[in-house]
Amino acid sequence: AKKNEIDVALIDTAGRLQNKKNLMEEYKKIINVLKKIDESFPNEVILVLDATTGQNAFNQVEEFSKIHNLTGLIITKLDSTAKGGVVLAICKKYNLPIVAIGMGEKEDDLQPFNAEYFSKALLGIET
């Protein structure tokens, strides 16, 4: 990306559980490679959380934060769970913004986060 003067490089990795230490080490390697290219990289680290994991999401954020500072969250599967409320507690504890939410499996089901819409959906208020 740098050689071709591209401003943005998106690195999407396979999902993994935070208790799989060998797989978590791969994230450290990615960060180290990026830092060799430019010490300021990565500029954004967004963790994608499955809303159905409930309280386990705290452990995920905690462990991923040990590898690199997170800058935001994407919350998926909000269309299939009532456990989305844990997201609010995570955002407060770790001071992280929600960047986007996933409300299905189609490409356009990933939407930029809208606090009003999210609040109403969480409370079961028709939007």
Predicted regions and their residues:
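P-loop/Walker A NTP-binding module and the surrounding RecA-like catalytic core of P-loop NTPases
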Residues: 1-127
